[in-house]
Every structure is written in structure tokens, then in C-alpha cells.
Amino acid sequence: MNRILTLFILFISLFIVCEATHFRFGTMSWMPMGSHNTIKFSSNYAFRIGFFKKFNKGCNVGDVVKVGDLDLGDDKTKVDVNLVVTSVNQADDWFTGEFSYTHTYNPIKLGGKAVTYKVVFTDCCRIKSLLNNAEGSWYISTSVVVDPNQGSDVSTFNRSPVSGMVPIITLNRDKNNQFLIAASDPNGDTLTYSLSNAYTMNQPSGLSIDSSKGIVSFKPTVSGFYSTQIMIKDTKGAYVVVDFLINSVIEPGVCHPSCSNGGNTCNGNSGCKSCKGTDSNGNTCSSFPPVFVYPPTPTDGSLLAYEVNKTNSFSIQCKTEEKSKTVFIQPANIPLAATLTSSDQNKQVSTLTYSMLPQLKHIGVYVISAYCTDNKGLVSTITSFSISVEKPICGHGTNKPGGGCNCETGWDPEKNCYECLKGHYGEKCDPVDPCVNGESNEGSQGNGKCTCYYGWEGKNCDIKVNQVCNANKENVVLDSSVAKSSYINPNFAQVYLNTDPSKQALTLSSKLSIPETIDKFEVLVLVDSQPSIVEYWDNFKKYSSDLTKNLQDISETVSIGLGLFSDAKTNGYSFVLKKSIGNGLSGLDDKDKAPASSYSTKNSLIALTSAAEFPAGWSTGSIKIIVLLTDNDYSATAQEVSKFTSTLISKSILPVVVSFNDNQNWDTLFKNQGFGSTKKTSNAKGNDWVSVATSAIKDVLSKAVVKAIDDTKGFLTLPSATTISIEDSKDYTIPIQIKYPQGQSDIPQNPSVSYSVVGFGITRIVINYNSAPTALGYSIETKQNVNYNFKLSGSDVDGNTLTIKFKTIPAASVGVIQADGVTIEQGDSFSIEKTFTFKPATNYYTKSTNDKFTFVANDGCLDSNEATVEIKITHVNQAPSCSSLSGSAISVTGLNTPKSFSLQGSDIETDSNLKIVFGDLTAISAYGNIKSGSNVVSTGSSVQLSSGSASLTFTQTKDIANDKEITVDFKVNDGSLDSSSSCSFKVKFVHFNKPPVAFAVTPLTIRQNSELKITISASDSDSDSVIFTLDDLKLGGGDSFFKCDDRSQLTAPFTTQPVSISGGVASFSEICYSSPLVNANSYASLVFFANDGQLSSDKFKVLININGDRPNAPPVVNQIPNFTMNEDDISNELVIDGIDPDELDQGKLKGIIIQKPTNGVILVKSGSSTSEAPIIGNAPYKIFYKPNPLYYGTDSFSYTVEDSMGERDATPKTTQITVQHVNHAPTLSIDPYDFTSQTSEKTLELTPKDIDLIDTVFHCTIVKLPATAIIKTSAGKVIDTVPTDLSDNKYIITSNNNIYNDFSDSFDAKCYDSSNAVSNIATGPITFRYINVPPKAESSDETLNQDSSVSFSVKATDLEDNSNVRAVIRSLPAKGTLTIKSTGKAAEISSTYAIDDFVYTPVAGYSNWDKPGHVGPADSFNFVAKDSKNDISSNIGTVSFFIEPRNPPTYEGLAVLYTKENTDLPFSISGIVGNGGSNVFLRIKSIVSRGSLYATHCMGTEGCMSEPNPVDININFTSQPYTFSFTPIEYENGDNYAIIEFVLYDKFNGQEVESQKYTIIINVIPVNQAPEVILIEHTLSTLPNNVIAFDKFKTVKMETNSYVIIKYDGTDIDDPKEKLKSYIVSPPLRGLLYVYDKDAKDGLGKLIKKDDTFVPVAQDGFWYIVFVPTPGSSGDGYVRIPISMVDFLGDISVPVTVAVDVSKKNIPPFITIENKNYTSLANTSIVVTGVSFDDPDSKYNDVELILSLVNKDGDLVSNKIATFSLSQQSKAKCTKHSEFAQFTCRSNKKTLNALISTMYVNHQGGGSYRLKVFVNDLGYSSPASIRDKNHMTATDYVELDVTKPEVTTTKENNNKTVLTGAIAGAAAGAGLLAAGAWFLLKKSAPPTDAFFGEGAFADGAVSTNPMYEESGRSAINPLYEASSENL
């Protein structure tokens, strides 16, 4: 039976859970991730499965469901809580889920103060069956401390504690229960535990927790569910909470063995008696539920440490000791990373086994809890353990030896591979795509997407948003926002409308979304408090709960409110809020009902309007309905009807009217306006109105009706109603047509309109249309001949991309404007982003008035104003110019013949100091020179110009092998500047042809009569051939000249063919001579010359001598030895000589050079000079060899000798020459370097020259630094020490950046060739000219809060004098004021100011929110910078202002509220979030009132919590309005009764922004109050001198046959007492009631009857009545006398009823004992007779009789030594005591007297004893109300004297001793004597406590009368609840 009861209780509790609301359990913890401000939140929650429609087909592990929002505590951030299901309990209809989220808070700089954020997950509702917190909101919170000062090792950062429990813990009712809160701390901190005092949490009474151990103790006294929340805090102040349910059940158990009923079944400790011991929990009633098995189950409270990427397993095992039972394990909060690998359930020993392979994303602590249940319903204790997934040192990587991490690709080793490198994102740290004009969402929690800066779009933010006004552009939606909590979306839209009427209207697809669960549904019921028929009111009170139930069928979480109105002519009113939204319909008091009124003002429409306007507690995003219950139709003016309609539309409230009477006007109105429903109820006296109201509510929810708000210009075209169903989860599309209206004027910029889907929500639309842009003027300030780059500016309120168009351009004499190098023309258009270049005309500068040009900006549709750009060109010293000589090169006619020429230069400044500065003249100086007058000009020298010209001469001093032109560079210098470029001229070195040199051997000797072959020769160094001419032939006679080949005669002149020159010599050997027989010298001769084609040689004459006939031997030439010499040297003397055997020829030989050397020259010396050697010379012919310049290598020449006879050595000799190379040092000259401050860095090169052709590699060294200039290597490294080698011989000359003036400087360098031969040290001249640089203006952003000012500096710099740069205003802000801080005056265009002297103040209320997309900049202005010289301006800089919205919330509720006198006024204050804000906070500033204001928070049927006088209360009601209740002082009224001042505010980055101060005035409407009856006192006739005041029960207790005088008073708050009348509402049905008349007998005046109930006031101003009961009658609740008052207006008081109890006087019972003394032997029965009792006023009711055998001390005698028995036991209800000789019997007195007529007593031992007789009449003759305290009793005794017999023992078979008969007889006689004596004693006086002692009354309490012994039973037998009259 007990088990069946237990199962039944469990079944009932499960049923309650299943039908209840949804929250079961929750806890949340956190840990830092990667940095101090990136926090990962992990949470576990449990909810009812059946609450979520998506689980209608089943709930499975891994499913995802949204359960609410998590508020992260930093003002704005809320995220969806999407639970992933981790476990499911289908039996108890709950599931657990896991949710995690990582959030980055604002970073705090190192050393900054830590910030604590409170993170909250809260919503409604808890289960409705809770014994505490029923239907309350849950509130799961934790505190997060963002502390930058925790070091760099994230693993040491503080983490919150972690906890977890099963959602429902089952405890035993009426037993001591203990369980452990499962919690751990990842940092190892000591934890403290406490009961949470969270908002909305009331802890169960008697529940406590050990603060250090976390052990909860609780002894529930009631069955059912409790909720509790435990706070767990670490040593650093971080806390978490765990919130769960406790199920208190009666669980059968067994009493402890130490109890008197040990082993018996019990349901609680109270069922176990006289216990001397307990179980371990302190219980005497113990049960034996299943238990967990440790191991394998981890020890309760233990911590398991798991490593990442390593598989672990754990098991949970539970068992029951009874073999017939099975157990089922229910785990909770199993991590998603854990997989169930084995399930062995429903066994005597059940086991679950899990495997877990944690990944990095699973790092954290998980608390797992479980319980198990056997198949008989017994539930185990909870077991819990934690799993800590520890962070490895290196997350996505491995440890480095010696420290550090080797990360996988994309992970950051500086963050131990837990965070991505910059430029990577996601779980795998993939590379982000390029983000050109935006910021990538990087990091391990990022998604890699590129968030574009304003004005850019595209995946990579590389596409410029070119929103250009297009006359053909269609209407389009620019932006929209969706609210998750709204039924209507978008709830905001921004659109662009083309003003062209031909454009098709824009369709905005508004979506009405019906979710699976209607969770935001609010209904205000408005009731007529003074209907024409009182049944209307009564039926509303009676059946309002039915309406609530019907509404809950639509939405389980419906919020209902109650309002009242009255249409009575007297004291009627339009609206009073009785119960705010969410507080339900219960608790309506009859005092709210006024007397029925048949006359109606028909003000129900005004009442409904007032109710819609009233701040009744509506919340944002809900479906809103007002249900009006009325018994009359409405009557109203057209204006009142219009206000009614507009109010409902603007508030988006659906009206429903239920009428108990006519509703024709309502029906017509609702049909005309298109929304609302009215129905009539057919039965005013039943609950038909509930079904009618429900039907009407469903009607208005069956269609979506759209109405416009604030659309006075007609932008919107709305569709007809859309049929919908709120029972189906579905989206409905409602098309809204938007078009620019035609024919309308004064349309504001960016107007806004709204539309209401009535009842479901409102959408606001901001409309943009195109406006003309604005062009901004500009000023160009540059220097002469200096180009200026600039952009033109414009702005457009529509955010369109602009183009600019040149309306005029500068005159050509001023300059040109170019774009990309192309000169623009008037009318050209360009993008506003285009950069232009203004090129001043050459040397032009502004002399007086600035030049100008104009432009307009265009947005694609409209031109702007025409803006002007002024041009100012400042004069600057210009470099001179030079002129190159054009045409042919300057050449001479001959060597050393000067050629004159002139060079020109000019300077616009007409400088007189112009000079020609020559470049490198080295190439010229080798062959000639340039002279200025007689001065030779050298490299770097200068020549003064005169009148722009310099006269010069060029002379060629050396011949050159070939003609050669050489270019000479030069510049013109004006004393400070060189010409900007070099000029040049050319000189030509001419080769002058050398004539050939004719030679031959002369004289020649020939024998007589013989022939001689004659060779003629010519040498020529610059010709290829010559022609010989025999100019003259002289013969002596007999001789002849002939050609040797054909012997033809030669005659002069004879010319040969061209003869080739070889080795510099051409020879012709075809002339023969024939001599005669004569002997003569100079006998013949020939003269010849050679011609090279241009020049002829001198004539050469050859003489011929004829000798006698003699033999002639040819000579032999001597060999000149081969030799070696150096390259630049002349050889030693060489001799051409020979030997001639002919004596005559000795000493007469001639040396002949047959072949000249190829690479050198043969020289002869004459004194100290040398010249080229002739071909023939007298032997010994002394010559020298000199190699050609720079030649080295081998060379040779050939030679021979010839004798006088013309014979030569037939074998010429050749000498080989080896010319050794001699290295030559290079030469270096450095060109001057002229540059300016604007010259780009140029790489220069040192170019040494070396005559050694083989030396082309040099290395150069800087040996002296410039004093002012900076010299750097080509790599850009500054050379600051010497010597410094130049690796590539290149260098860079720059100026010091701090030099702002001209200077001249120089440096020295030298170079080495490859043989380390060093050059000369050359000096490099440096000339620097500083050009004043325009200052630089930089655009900058300034951020400020709305409605505040910002002091700032414009960003401007000047290279030359940064401290004195100034700003010139070019345009002013459009939406604010620019003020000069130092003067307080407004800035002006074109005025100059210090750059740090600005203050910007935006116009009131203006911010980024007012820009498209709510993105700044919201305002800007332009400026240029001026330098200290004030002669040049910068580029345009723009200062943009980003104005953070700081719009406080606004209050749009009523300023005046009304309530009735003596009526509480509930009202709400709601606010609209300010533009750009996110919250609405409320602060009450002051309350001026005699009443009381309470801030309340209502939680459904659980009721409301109130806080009195909430001044300075700070409330956040962003999603819900905050409800207040105002209570006026009773019976007070009046206008301005209460004045409440408050502000609304929002928080922006922790800073509060307050609204204006709002005031709500409460007027208390006077209401005529009914009078009041005041009972004063009454006087009983039985106690005439004892005046008795009335107590709270208003009861008169009187005795029968007496009377009572009742005195009472009346009062009326509105009127004096004299105007009151009193009457008896209903005369009594028994007894008589009189008006008291002191002069009448017994005071009995006028009899009060049905037709005359009036009671006149007595002379003392009080009222008196007298009540006389019917004689002899009595009873509790005898009569009720209702007394009432009525005032002169007819208002009747609430009747005050006097209850009269009439009672008889209870008569005590008495006992009669005929024989009071008996004597007997032991073991012999004593027969007691003659005992009886009587209760005179008892007849049929029960009387209690107790018979006990006691000793002389009154102690009960054990039934083991004495027994007695009664007759007729079966007729009475008797209980025999289990240990003592005692009977307790109950019955009527007749039955009990029969029972004791004969009694038998048997005592086994001797002694004196008593038979105690106790009678209790149980007080049944007394009134029931005092019966338990008015028991009457009687007590008497029979004396028993028992003696042991003198034993003569006879042995019997049963071994018993038998008393002799004599002894037995003596005993019997003694008993009879005792009985008689007792009877006489009783007659004389009843016995008292003093007689018997306390022992006689040990079983009961003693009454005040010592005669009477009170029964121990205080209960009343319901069988005898009757008046004493019946007894």
C-alpha cells in the first residue's frame, strides 16, 4: 500500500511538471581566451520539452533550440542563447542543453583599473506548481572581471568557479536531507557557498548550506516542488550560481531499531515513537533507495583531469540491494564531447560508459551530475564529479625545447598557438582575404569577413560605392533592420524615392511572422464597474478565470491586465487601471463595484481611448488587445472617434468590445475603420460572455490590418487586410507601396512615416530623396614656376558621389589646369576624387589681383552652386637659362689657328652677374684649348657674360688621327642658381693630312756598260698608297732609263700606278738604267716625287755614278738583338750597320728600314729632341724605338744595308720587340652637383679615367665630408666617417632636413684602379637651393558625443617652421558651429587661426544617427594650412566629425493620470529607446504626495514585489515597462494629488545620458464613500456590570434564557454622522430583536420586524439594539444580526454582522460506587459491582470512560501482574492498553454503565490497590467553539486489598499453586466493605487533585476546576456537531 502511495505521488508530481511552465535548471561559468578581455562563457540549462513546438515530434541529443537572450553586461551586447541538447528525460519532460559564446570586451590598457561586468540570463517563467517563486522569472548570473594586470600568461588568469547539478533533486518530506553542491575552481581557489539573494528568488524556508563545504541541509514539510539557487564564489570575487528544483516526496521507510515501533513502515520521522537513535542523516524513518557504486563511478565531488587530443573514459554505475528491483541512471550535463559507448540500464546494477576525446575547443571544466531511480520509485542521492580539460602549453602546436611553441600554420607562437596570427581567422586560422578599405574579422573567433569602411563595398572592400543620383533610378530600399522580438519586420527601413512621378512605386515587403510559440501576447480587460444589472459584475468576477484560461490556450505566457470605467451619470469616470499588464484578473474587490446604474453616459469609446493611452505596462514587440466589457453602446463626437482610431493605430492595439446590450455604433465604427471586433453576449447571467470575448479576440487575430501613422503627405499606399492564422507558424508578406507624393509642398528633408499592422507592431520608414549638392570654394597658393596639385570639394546630404565641372578656367597667360597630364578645357567634367595640377605659365606670378576660375558639383541629377577658386602665385628667384650652340661643330682650318665663337645666357631677373660655368674640359685639353681672351678655360671655371654673351676662341694645337667632335657642357649661373639644365656646344678636332716623303738611295754607283735596277720609295703614315712621278730624267749620253719588265724606254714625266704602302713605306722598283763605257760621277740622274692623292712629297733626286768595271759583293746587315722594354719608355740606341767585303764600300754603307714597326715608331735624336727616323741613313744608322702610347705587347721592324753600288743584303734582318705593360694611375674629376629642396634624390657616380685600356674597374673612397650637405651610399646609408669606400662608386647628395636655406659645399674623393694605383684627390662642388615647401594639411576625424562640444587641433605641419603654422578656414560645418576657443567667436571663412584653437558644437540632437545607415561622419569643414611666411598654402584638409548618438530615451505616455478615491492606481512608465541607444533606464527624481508610490515587479500568478518610495531607483526596462502602484491616503482626493518627477536615461560606454525631466500628475477622483458600521460593545443580562468590547470575530456568547444589549456607531467620510440612518438588513429568524429603550422594562423598546427594520439613533449619538433568544434554546451560530447604514445619497454600507452563540451551562458528570472496598487473595478474581455514573445533560452523545488499576501512589499497574475484564465489551468502543491494566472506552452513558456493571479484577501479588474510574463528558453540552475547553469530568476509586494466601501446596499437573477457599472468601468480603465506604465518601464530596495527587491525571491536562480532569483528546467528533438542545 505504501509503495502504491509513493508511485501515485510521483505520478502526480510528474503530471504537475509536465503541465507547468518551462525553466528547470541553469548555471553559467566563464574563462579568459587568449587575452584578458576575451571571455568564453559556458552554460548548462534545463527546460520543459513540451514548451517548444519544435520538439513536438521528439527531442534528441544534438538538437538546437533558442531559449532566450544572454546579456553580456556591456550596455548593448545581447546574444541568442541557442542550446545544444545534451540529455533528454522523456519521463519527466525535461532536457538539458549546453551553450557557449566567446565575447571580447573593450580592452583596458596595462595598469588600468579592472572592470567588472555582470552577465545575466533571465526571462520568465519558472514552473507554476512551485511552492516558492511560482511562475517567477529565472535569473542566472555571473560576475566577470576584466583585468589587464594579470600578466601575459593566460593560463594563470582567473577563471570562474564551475558548477552543475541535475535539474530536479528528489528529497524526502519530513526527513532530514543533505546533498553536496557540485562545484570546482579551475584555479584551485577555495570556494564559499551561500544561498543566492538574486532578484525574484525566495529561498525555501528551512534550507541552509555549509558555507565552506557546500553541503545543503533541508527538511521539507510539504510535498511538492521548491526552487533554490546557490551562489559559489572564489577568493577573487568571481561568482557563479546554480539554480535547480527540489522535489519533496513522501517516501516510505522503516523506523529505526531504537524506536518503540522499530521496524515498522513509516512515511516520516513523526511515525516513529520513543526513538533513542537515528540514521546518519538524523532520521528515525529511513528508506533504502538505490546507491551509486564507487568506483567505477568517480567519487562524489572528485575532479578528473583530461588532456587535449587524448581519449578518456568514465562510467556511472548504480545498484539496488534488492534483487527484485532494477535501477535506471539519469545523467545531466554530459559534455557534447563525450560519447555514450555503452548503456546497460534497467538492471539490478546499471552502468553507463562514456568516451571523451576533448579538442582545444573543449577546454574548460564540466560538472556532471546523475541520480538513479529504482522501478518502485525510490530515488538515489545525487552524485557529481568534474572533468577538467586542461589547456596544453601550446594549443595548436608543439613545445619547443627550452621554451616557446612551434605552431601550426596560421597560429601565433607569442600567444602559445591559441590565437591566430594577424591576417588569419577561424578555428583553423586560415588566411583572411585582402581587405583593402576595411577591417577583417580576424582571430580564432573571427569569420574572416571584411567589414568595409563607409563608402566601400565588395568582398574585399575594394569597390567604391558610387551612389550617384540617377534621374532614371528606381525607388529602392537603402537600409532596414529586423528585431528578433518583433512580429512585424522590418521594424525600420530607409528608402530612396525618385521624385519623378513616372517611376513605379517602391514595394516594401513587410513580414508578419507567427512563431511556433506565441510568447509575447498582452491583453487589457476593461470592465464597466457600474453596470445597469449587478449580475454583469458578478459574472465577470466569477468567470474571469475562464477568460484567462482561454487566453492561455492562445499563448501560454499571455500577460493580462485589468482596467475599470464607469458610465454612470453620478461618479462616472473614463478609466482607472486596476491591474497592470502581467498581473492578471484575480483579486477584484466588491469595493470596486459601484451601485447599479440604469442611466449611462455611453462613454465606453472614451474609456477605451483612455485605456489605450494609459501606461498600463505594455511591452515592446507584443501583440496588444484591449477587451471592453460594457452594457451600453457608445456615443461620441467625430473628434473623439478620430482620436480613438488614431490612438489605437499609433499604439498598435486591437480593440474588442463585448456588449451585454446594444452595440450598433461599435459595429459600424469597426467596419468603417477596418479593424476591431464587437459581439453581443446572449446570456448576461452566465459565462457566455467568455466564449463571446474569446471568439472576438480570435476574430481580430485572424487578419492583419495596416494603417498609416504620420503620413500627412501621402507617401504610403497600404494593402487591404490579410487573412492570417496565429495557430500556424508562418510568415505573411504584407506589401507596402511607397512613392514620392506629387503636388505637395514643404516636404522636409528626410521625412519619416510609419505604418501599424494594428495589434502586431509598427514599422518606421525614413525617406530619402535627392537634394542639390554644395560646392566648396578653394584657394590655390603656389610659387612662380611651381606646379600645384589639388582636389576640389563638395558635399551632398544624400551621400551621392559627386562630379565637378569647370565653368571657367584660368587665362593661358596665368597657367593651365591639367588632369593626368592633359590640359582641361572649359566645360570638362571629372570625378570629385580627381587630383588636378595647376601649372603656372612660365615665370608668371601674381602682381596684384588674384586670378580665378569657377566650378560646380553635380550629383548626377542636379548642379550645385558655382564655387570660386582663387589663384595666387608668389614670385621666386628663377634659375637663369642658357642656350646651346646649334649647327655644325666649331672647327679650325689648321693647327694653332684660333677659331672665335660666343655663348649666350639669360635671366628673367636681368641679373648682371651671369657667368658661364664649364663642365669637364679634359677631352679638349689633350688636343687644344678654349680661351676667354688670353686665358685658357679649365674644368669648372667660369666666364662672365656681357649682355648675355661671352666671346671665346677655340684652338687645335695637336693633330688627330681622325676627325673627332667633342661636346662641351656648360651652365649659366646668376650668382645663386645654376640654370635648370645644362647647355652644350661642339668642337671638331680635324686631322690634317701629311704629304708623303720621297726617298731613295743616292748616289748610286754602276759599272760601265752595265744595268742598274733603281728603287724609289716614299713613306706616308696616313695614306694607303702613293703614285710616283718621274719628273726629270737626265742622261749623260749613251745611257738610257727603261722599264725593267718590258725594257720600254722611259721618258719624263712618267707616272706609276698607285703603289700600296706597307709598313708605312711604298717602293717602286721597275726603273732600270743602262750605263755606257764611261767613267764619271753624277753622269746621270732622275728626279721623282710621290703623291698620296691630296698632297705631293718634295722632289727627290737620285744621282748615278759610273765607275770602272769592278766586281761588287753585296753587303751583309748586322742583326740587332731582340729586346724588351717598358710601355712608356724609349729604347736604348739601336744601330743599323753591316759588313761589306768590298773595300771600296766599307764605311759607305747605308742603313735602310725595310719595314717600320706596327705599334711604335723609329726615332732619331738630334740633341735632346727626337724625331721620326728617315728610311735611309748612313751606317752605322743610330735609331731608337718608342711604342705607340699605351701600347704593350710585341712589335718588330725589318732593315738592311746597301752599298755604294746599290747592292743590298738580300736577306733583311728583323728585330722582335717585347713592350711590357706599365700601370698608370687613374685620374678623377667630379662634376658639380646643383640641387634644390624639391629635387628627388639622385644617385650620382664617380667616373675616374685611366689611360690604361685594360683598367675598367675602379673603387672610390670619400676622403672628406661636406660640411652641411649629407652624403650617402647608393643604399641610402649616411656616410659620417672618412675614409669610406663606395662599394659601387655611387653616392647620393641630400640636404639635412633641418636646413631651410641655400648653401654651397663640397666633398673630396679619390679612386683606385685594379692595381691599387690611386688617382688624384678630386673635389666635388655642391650647390643647394632651398625652395619653400608648402605646409601640409592632413584630414582628421574627431569623435564626440551628441549635444556636446569637442576642442581639437587641425592637423597641419610646416617643414620649415612647424610651430607657427596656421589654419585658414575654407568652408564651415553644415550641422554645427565652429568656434575659436581663445576668443569665443565663430570662425569665418578665409580667416586665419592657430591650429589648436578650435571648438566644434553640433546642432542640438544631431548625430551620426541622422546620416544614411547611421554612419558618420555627420559633419565636416575644410581648411588649408599657411606657413610662417604666409606666402604659400597647403592642400585642403578636412576635419570630419563623428558624432556618437547620445539620444536619451523619450517618454510618450500620459502626463496626467486619474484614479478613484480609495483605489490603488497601477501604472507603468515606458520609454522609447533614443536614436542610437539600446536601453531605457528610469530614475525617479522626486515624489510629492501624501499617498504612497510603490515600484512593483509582477511575475504572473506569483504576484508582485513592491518597493516603497522608489526615489533614485534605477530601473532597466528596455524590453518590459516598469510598473508602479500609487495608493492615495484613504478617503482623500483632489487634483495634483501626486506629482512624480522622473528622467529616462541610457548608458553609452558606461556614461549616463539623461532625458529631460518628465512629470506625471495623478488626480484622485472624489467618490462618494459608503458609510461604515462600527461595533462598539455589548452587555449580557447575566453580567449587567461587565461591558464586553467586540473582538475581531464580532461574536456575542450568551447563555440561554438571557438577553444582550448591543451598542454600535456609524461613520461616513463624506458626510456628518447626523445624516446617517441605520437599519437591520434582515431580522433574526430565532429570538426577538428590539430597539433599546432605557426607559422600557428590560430596555426592550420597539420590536424590529421585516417591515420595520429602522433603528433610531439614541440621544448619545449611538445606536442600541437588544436581542432575546427563544427561551430554553441554545446553539453555536444561533443567529446572525446584519446591521447597515445608509447615507443621504443612498449609498449603503457594507453590512456588519453580529454572530450570537447561545449556550447551556454544562453540568458535570458524577460517579456512584455502592461498595468502595474489596479484599481478596492474590490470583483470585475480585468481582466489582455497583459502579455507575451519570451526566445529567447528556443523552445520546459519547462520553469517555477510563478504568485503570493503580497503586497507592497512583501509578498504573502493569498488566503482567494484574488484569481485569469488563462485561459487554462488544457494545462499546474500548481500547486496552498494551502494557498496563487500563481500558479506555467511548460510547453513550447507557452503554458504558452496562459495561461496568460487573468488573473482574485479578492480581497475582499482594498489596493495596485502587480501581480508578474516570468519566469525561467531552464538553458536548457546550457550544462547539468552546467545547474542547469546557470538558467536565468526575473521578472515583474502588479500594482493593489483596493478600498472599498461606499456601498449602498441592501438586497439580499444571504446577499451579491454588489458594484455599477461605482466603478467597475473606478477600471477597473485604472488597464489599471497601465498596460501601467509598460510596459514602463520594456522596459527601467529589475527590480532588489534592486527594489523589498528580498521578491520577497523568494521561491528560487538568482544567481550571480541580474537580475536572480534561481529556487528552482535543479533536471534535464530527458525528456530534449539534446544538445542546438535542442532547
Curated annotation (Swiss-Prot):
Residues 522-709 form the VWFA domain. One of its GO terms (molecular function) is calcium ion binding. It is found in: Membrane. Residues 21-1860 are extracellular. GO terms for cellular component: cell surface; early endosome; plasma membrane; recycling endosome. Residues 425-462 form the EGF-like domain. Glycans are attached at N309, N1122, N1516, N1717, N1723, N1855. The chain crosses the membrane at residues 1861-1881. CDD domains: FU (cd00064). It is a single-pass type I membrane protein. InterPro entries: Cadherin-like_sf (IPR015919), EGF-like_dom (IPR000742), Furin_repeat (IPR006212), Ig-like_fold (IPR013783), Ig_SibA-E (IPR056851), Ig_SibA-E_2nd (IPR056847), Ig_SibA-E_3rd (IPR056849), MEGF/SIB (IPR052108). Disulfide bonds join C435-C450, C452-C461. Its main location: membrane. Residues 1882-1927 are cytoplasmic. Keywords: Cell adhesion, Disulfide bond, EGF-like domain, Glycoprotein, Membrane, Signal, Transmembrane, Transmembrane helix. Residues 1-20 form the signal peptide. GO terms for biological process: cell-substrate adhesion; phagocytosis. Belongs to the SIB family. Interacts with talA/talin. Implicated in cellular adhesion to substrate or phagocytic particles. This is Integrin beta-like protein A. It comes from Dictyostelium discoideum (Social amoeba). The lineage of its organism: Eukaryota, Amoebozoa, Evosea, Eumycetozoa, Dictyostelia. The gene is sibA.
